[in-house]
Amino acid sequence: MENTTRPLKSKISDEANAVLLLTALARAASADTNVSVPELKKVQEIMKRETGHEVVSSDVYIASKSQLFEKVPLEKSVYRWSRKMPPGRRQRLAVEIAEVCKADGEFNDMEAAYFNAMVESLRLTPSQLISIAA
């Protein structure tokens, strides 16, 4: 059986990967229960950079509430997705999630819990996080 899984390129072009990226970022924006304008703009900026497509605010708001409709928890989906990502891309995604969480100038306990769950799902170690923070 041929392996049809291909690694992510520097830009995310696959629609399913783009949806998962939007969901992960939108949930980061709503981790503290509301999506602020700076968080919304940060999600839109990252999506444009990573996918080449503009995302409207309504898409971000819908994705931020997608846990109401999901059959598989986001953490599990991100874990599966991360197995196909090179370590550098996983680290970059962790940074992007942190950027969204901090976009409104705050980083509270709910955002920290979400970030920690995503880092675990991305299979990143503390030393890998230190290397990108330096």
Can you say where each PLM-predicted feature lies in the sequence?
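Small-residue-enriched hydrophobic alpha-helices in membranes
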Residues: 1-134
